[in-house]
């Protein structure tokens, strides 16, 4: 029986990508970014190793959702104290902390364990077009080409 060769974790060459979220649909952007973070786009993908790349998402405040979701989609969080449940709509959260919307959507598509937390640390989300990762020379990652044509 042949053994499957695994890439040594220190030999994985991680790329940096930048994604412009302007006029992108939240879920469609999140699925593609989650696949890159997970490493599914790499030929050396292994489910139990973190082989993913770094992703920088800019223009988080310009993300789109369809239908009545801006008024009806709710984001819940709890402080851990009695009566500490906070509920906020997509619109309100987008105005206050637009980065959290993108982070929460992508985090829900990663594994829910220590490996998923490690993958999530490679995601950087920013409001506006500026980001502090220019030294890493991130390459633009083209997502959903049909949405940019509209």
Swiss-Prot record:
GO biological process: negative regulation of translation; translation
Record keywords, A-Z: Ribonucleoprotein, Ribosomal protein
Residue numbers spanned by region Disordered: 129-150
Positions with biased composition (Polar residues): 139-150
One GO CC term on file: cytosolic large ribosomal subunit
GO molecular function: mRNA binding; structural constituent of ribosome
PROSITE patterns, A to Z: RIBOSOMAL_L13
Cleaved signal peptide residues: none
Keyword Ribosomal protein on entry: yes
Ribonucleoprotein keyword on record: yes
SUPFAM superfamilies, per the entry: Ribosomal protein L13
Domain of life: Bacteria
Function: This protein is one of the early assembly proteins of the 50S ribosomal subunit, although it is not seen to bind rRNA by itself. It is important during the early stages of 50S assembly.
Assembly information from the UniProt record: Part of the 50S ribosomal subunit.
Family statement drawn from the similarity comment of this UniProt entry: Belongs to the universal ribosomal protein uL13 family.
Family matches, as NCBIfam families: rplM_bact (TIGR01066)
Protein known as: Large ribosomal subunit protein uL13
